[in-house]
């Protein structure tokens, strides 16, 4: 048996030989962006690369429920190490990661979870917190319009002994939050506030790699400040699926049982984790700080599109910090449906005012979207508004 199979890693010669074979095959979807090349709806639509398929073909096939899959175990240990945490646990989706984290942090009932009113856990996780944790969500509009700060927690957290109230026991944050980078110093303030008030913390880091790419902080700096952190490999990193929870050993052990209880245990987990590992290495790097230029190039594309929109007379709802652009369609009298239809005319897939860039968007799609901006904005905004009445 080769060393590669024993340790769950792929050496360069093995990888290149498999890639040569894969590249000679016809009608293979892996490594082909397909419709993702012109899809600005989200970065979840990225397609896995041939290198990821190569990693899958060379993975170990142990049983992860029995903790016998080396590829999975080594990947969990690697991500935990570069994040500065005791242990990591791989799960199939970011939603599962978030919900397992929140469930693990519920120590008493009733339990209130304070989070941004725009958070993924509120709008896009099928009410998982009520089903799995029996917790009450306490949504708060961030006062800076971007992300939660200590001032928001001080104003809205319920820390009273009043028996009429559901006490705030957990604070859940996102980074990035709608594309905005949460500074390390702000998370440090929240950590200190939470400790003083006996509140647990969770970070939805589905796009944490985007924040690290900006130079705002390393994985270790961010992950060291929060009780439980979840990171995603299937967005701009391009893995077919997968996320990881990072925290202390005791909590992770507890969550392994809960993961099994909700059907998240994986048998031959290496088939999934090998691709996720390769996605991390390809599009981020091996360490706690970014090594690949992939994400930074995507940020440049996002900023260019934002500049084109404003140069043609459009307005932005939020500053562009990473890979997400928020267009103010109302300011130019454009309905969401009109914008989507116009994109379809030019061959790009849109979903309203949020434009999400990723590494598989090609230059032709970028130019086509700029043409959409021009077509939309060349009309008189007042006329557009009147036509909607």
Curated annotation (Swiss-Prot):
Residue positions, PTM N6-(pyridoxal phosphate)lysine: 235
Catalytic activity annotation: L-alanine = D-alanine
Cited Pfam families: Beta_elim_lyase
CDD domains named in the record: TA_like
Names of required cofactors: pyridoxal 5'-phosphate
Pathway(s) of this molecule: Mycotoxin biosynthesis; HC-toxin biosynthesis
Gene Ontology process terms (BP): glycine biosynthetic process; threonine catabolic process; toxin biosynthetic process
TM region positions: none
GO-annotated cellular components: cytosol
EC number: 5.1.1.1
Gene3D superfamilies, per database record: Aspartate Aminotransferase, domain 1, Type I PLP-dependent aspartate aminotransferase-like (Major domain)
Molecular function GO terms recorded: alanine racemase activity; L-allo-threonine aldolase activity
Disrupted gene: phenotype observed: Reduces pathogenicity of the fungus on maize.
Keyword annotations: Isomerase, Pyridoxal phosphate
InterPro entries reported for this sequence: ArAA_b-elim_lyase/Thr_aldolase, Low_specificity_L-TA-like, PyrdxlP-dep_Trfase, PyrdxlP-dep_Trfase_major, PyrdxlP-dep_Trfase_small
Family statement drawn from the similarity comment of this UniProt entry: Belongs to the threonine aldolase family.
Note: The genes involved in HC-toxin biosynthesis, called collectively TOX2, are organized into a diffuse cluster that spans >500 kb. All of the known genes are duplicated or triplicated within this region, with some variation in copy number and chromosomal location among different race 1 strains.
Record's function text: Alanine racemase, part of the diffuse TOX2 gene cluster that mediates the biosynthesis of the HC-toxin, cyclic tetrapeptide of structure cyclo(D-Pro-L-Ala-D-Ala-L-Aeo), where Aeo stands for 2-amino-9,10-epoxi-8-oxodecanoic acid. HC-toxin is a determinant of specificity and virulence in the interaction between the producing fungus and its host, maize. TOXG catalyzes the conversion of L-alanine into D-alanine, an essential precursor for the production of the major forms of HC-toxin by the non-ribosomal peptide synthetase HTS1.
PANTHER family, alphabetized: L-THREONINE ALDOLASE, L-THREONINE ALDOLASE-RELATED
The protein's name: Alanine racemase TOXG
The encoding gene: TOXG
């Amino acid at each position: 048996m080769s060393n590669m199979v024993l340790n769950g890693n792929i050496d360069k010669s093995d990888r290149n030989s498999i890639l040569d074979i894969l590249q000679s095959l016809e009608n293979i979807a892996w490594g082909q962006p397909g419709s993702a090349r012109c899809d600005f709806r989200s970065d979840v639509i990225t397609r896995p690369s041939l290198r990821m398929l190569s990693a899958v073909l060379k993975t170990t096939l142990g049983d992860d429920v029995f903790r016998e899959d080396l590829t999975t175990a080594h990947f969990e240990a690697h991500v935990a190490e570069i994040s500065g945490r005791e242990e990591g646990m791989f799960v199939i989706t970011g939603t599962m990661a978030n919900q397992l984290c929140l469930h693990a942090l519920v120590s008493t009932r009733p339990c209130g979870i304070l989070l941004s009113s725009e958070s993924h856990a509120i709008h896009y996780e099928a009410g998982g917190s009520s089903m799995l944790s029996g917790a009450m969500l306490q949504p708060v509009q961030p006062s800076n319009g971007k992300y939660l700060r200590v001032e928001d927690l001080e104003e809205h957290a319920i820390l009273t002994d009043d028996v009429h109230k559901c006490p705030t026991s957990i604070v859940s944050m996102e980074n990035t939050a709608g594309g905005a980078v949460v500074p390390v110093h702000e998370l440090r303030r929240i950590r200190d506030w939470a400790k003083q008030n006996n509140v647990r913390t969770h970070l939805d880091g589905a796009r944490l790699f985007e924040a690290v790419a900006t130079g705002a902080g390393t994985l270790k700096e961010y992950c060291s400040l929060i009780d439980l952190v979840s990171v995603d490999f299937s967005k701009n990193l391009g893995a077919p699926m997968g996320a990881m929870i990072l925290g202390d050993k005791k909590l992770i052990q507890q969550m392994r049982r809960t993961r099994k209880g909700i059907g998240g245990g994986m048998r031959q987990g290496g088939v999934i984790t090998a691709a996720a590992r390769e996605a991390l290495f390809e599009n981020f790097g091996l360490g706690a700080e970014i090594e690949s230029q992939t994400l930074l190039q995507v940020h440049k594309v996002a900023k260019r599109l934002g500049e084109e929109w404003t140069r043609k007379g459009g307005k932005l709802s939020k500053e562009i910090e990473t890979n997400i652009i928020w267009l103010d369609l109302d300011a130019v009298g454009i309905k969401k449906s009109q914008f989507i239809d116009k994109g379809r005319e030019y061959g790009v897939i849109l979903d309203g005012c949020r434009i999400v860039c990723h590494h598989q968007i090609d230059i032709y799609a970028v130019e086509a979207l700029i043409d959409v901006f021009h077509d939309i904005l060349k009309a008189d905004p007042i006329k557009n508004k009147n036509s909607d009445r």
